[in-house]
Curated annotation (Swiss-Prot):
NCBIfam families: PRK00977.1-5, xseB. Keywords: Cytoplasm, Exonuclease, Hydrolase, Nuclease. Its main location: cytoplasm. Heterooligomer composed of large and small subunits. Its EC number is 3.1.11.6. This is Exodeoxyribonuclease 7 small subunit. One of its GO terms (cellular component) is exodeoxyribonuclease VII complex.
Length: 97
């Protein structure tokens, strides 16, 4: 006999949900999906749908992070440099104030 979803449970996704409006919403949805999957209460089909939705959300989040990184590069130009140990030691000092 096929396993039925519990009353009130919504399937994690069938691939037709629109993408969230922003990174934070996508991350929150992804965390919810992970918690549901780790809970072990999802059917095999729902687990697969949740995995697919999660993969879509991860790709969306990566894309959003890349966009922001590109914007930071444009704003900072070529001044982005790896943080050195000497720079970290002076971060606590506020000479400009």
């Amino acid at each position: 006999m096929a396993k039925t979803a519990s009353p009130g449970a919504t399937p994690p996704g069938n691939g037709t949900e629109p993408l969230p409006d922003n990174y934070e919403m996508a991350l929150a949805e992804l965390e919810t999906l992970v918690a549901r999957m780790e809970g072990g209460a999802l059917s095999l089909e729902d687990s697969l749908a949740a995995y697919r939705r999660g993969a879509t959300l991860v790709a969306f989040c990566q894309q959003q992070l890349e966009k922001v990184e590109q914007q930071v590069r444009v704003l900072d130009g070529a001044t982005l440099k790896p943080l050195s140990s000497g720079t970290a030691a002076t971060d606590g000092e506020d000479d400009d104030l």
